[in-house]
């Protein structure tokens, strides 16, 4: 496994979207920065908020794009090109409709599951899907016609607590990923349910 050099939290920009389910990836990156006594600062050349942390002796960049979700690839590509980071050295945290709140999974590669942020990142990397994904469960509204309103809605307190607990576990597993590797990280992460 390549070492992770860039961790991205997908989100829509602005206060109107800050607490919506679609911003779960940004919640994870914000908390990761806080736990390492860093704050994300806007950096226009990367079209997002960035920070730099040390994860178990590894120099890691953090990025929360300020583009809208469907243009996330622009920010990821800008930072990856500038720091010469390969797709398999990137972990993208995002909301996942196919997992319930309180569950989080990690994987390398795969499809985009209809997620516009992932879709745009893949297209910017010449349709290379081989980057890591941290899939933060937000649940599904049960009807595909209600998905847009659902992901752009704020979760009720009970669901928010489950999502927050899953993000806490994901943070612990990020340390394991960097220290002990992918297999150990997913063994722990995939057995967790808030």
Swiss-Prot record:
Q: In the UniProt record, does the keyword Hydrolase occur?
A: yes
What GO terms are given for molecular function?
peptidyl-tRNA hydrolase activity; tRNA binding
Keywords on record: Cytoplasm, Hydrolase, RNA-binding, tRNA-binding
So what does this thing catalyse?
an N-acyl-L-alpha-aminoacyl-tRNA + H2O = an N-acyl-L-amino acid + a tRNA + H(+)
- Cited Gene3D superfamilies: Peptidyl-tRNA hydrolase
Q: Kindly report the protein's main subcellular placement as a broad class.
A: cytoplasm
Mind telling me which InterPro entries this protein's record contains? Answer: Pept_tRNA_hydro (IPR001328), Pept_tRNA_hydro_CS (IPR018171), Pept_tRNA_hydro_sf (IPR036416)
Picking any one GO biological process from the record gives: protein quality control for misfolded or incompletely synthesized proteins
| Pfam families per UniProt | Pept_tRNA_hydro
Q: Where is this site: Discriminates between blocked and unblocked aminoacyl-tRNA?
A: 12
Query: Which EC class does it fall in?
Result: hydrolase
Hydrolase: is it a keyword of this entry? yes
Which N-terminal residues, if any, form the signal peptide?
none
Q: Tell me the residue numbers annotated for binding tRNA.
A: 17, 68, 70, 116
Residues in the active site? Answer: 22 (proton acceptor)
Query: In the Enzyme Commission scheme, what number(s) does this protein have?
Result: 3.1.1.29
- Give the location in the cell: Cytoplasm
User: One cellular component GO annotation, for this chain's record?
Assistant: cytoplasm
Site-annotated residues for Stabilizes the basic form of H active site to accept a proton:
95
Report the sequence similarity comment from the record: Belongs to the PTH family.
Question: What HAMAP family is this protein classified in?
Answer: Pept_tRNA_hydro_bact
What function does this protein fulfil?
Answer: Hydrolyzes ribosome-free peptidyl-tRNAs (with 1 or more amino acids incorporated), which drop off the ribosome during protein synthesis, or as a result of ribosome stalling.
Q: What is annotated about its quaternary structure and interactions?
A: Monomer.
The name on file for this protein is Peptidyl-tRNA hydrolase
